[in-house]
Amino acid sequence: MSILISPSNNTGWGLRFPSKMFGGAKKRSDQHPVRVRGHYRAPWGAHKRGRTGRTTVDDAIDAVVEEARNYTPTPPPVSTVDAAIQTVVRGARRYAKMKRRRRRVARRHRRRPGTAAQRAAAALLNRARRTGRRAAMRAARRLAAGIVTVPPRSRRRAAAAAAAAISAMTQGRRGNVYWVRDSVSGLRVPVRTRPPRN
């Protein structure tokens, strides 16, 4: 292993320039000894070139940076005027919603003056809701038996009015209404059960 003994910052062996071999002398002598150890490079980080230690200014800067990092903005002051306005708006919306609900319920339960057929159809549906399917069929047969004496044109009008009333009353209820021709009177009557297919 060769040893680098050039005094010119480790840039060469000094073979082309013999004057660099012995510290500027042409030949080695006691007045110009060769310092091999002094020309080795120091390990990395041994010489801190231009770097100084921490000062009080660095501590102050670090304190400011830490305070800025931990900064939490204060919430804005609560405005009582905005809170009052929001309360009034919420109350107005609640009142309007309640009025809409009441109007909807009143429209649903509004009683329209109807004909005898419409009242009979309403009574039939109410009775069917109370007593079940078999009672509904019995009530339909009784209703059909009672309408036999109505003249033909009035009978058609009454049937149409009853159908309209029944369809209007059964819109919000689940289930189907089947129109079945009664074998006794020959009229179509509403039933809840599906008739058998012949």
UniProtKB/Swiss-Prot annotation:
The keyword Acetylation applies. The modification N6-acetyllysine is found at residues 27, 48. GO terms for cellular component: host cell; host cell nucleolus; viral capsid. One of its GO terms (biological process) is viral penetration into host nucleus. The keyword Acetylation applies. Residues 24-55 are annotated as: Disordered. GO terms for molecular function: DNA binding. The modification Phosphoserine is found at residues 183, 185. Residues 34-52 have a biased composition (Basic residues). The modification Phosphothreonine is found at residues 55, 74. A motif (Nuclear localization signal) lies at residues 188-198. The record marks 24-25 as: Cleavage. Interacts with the core-capsid bridging protein; this interaction bridges the virus core to the capsid. Interacts with host NPM1; this interaction might play a role in placing the pre-histone-like nucleoprotein on the viral DNA or regulating viral gene expression. Interacts with host HMGB1; this interaction inhibits host immune response. This is Pre-histone-like nucleoprotein. It comes from Human adenovirus C serotype 2 (HAdV-2). The gene is L2.
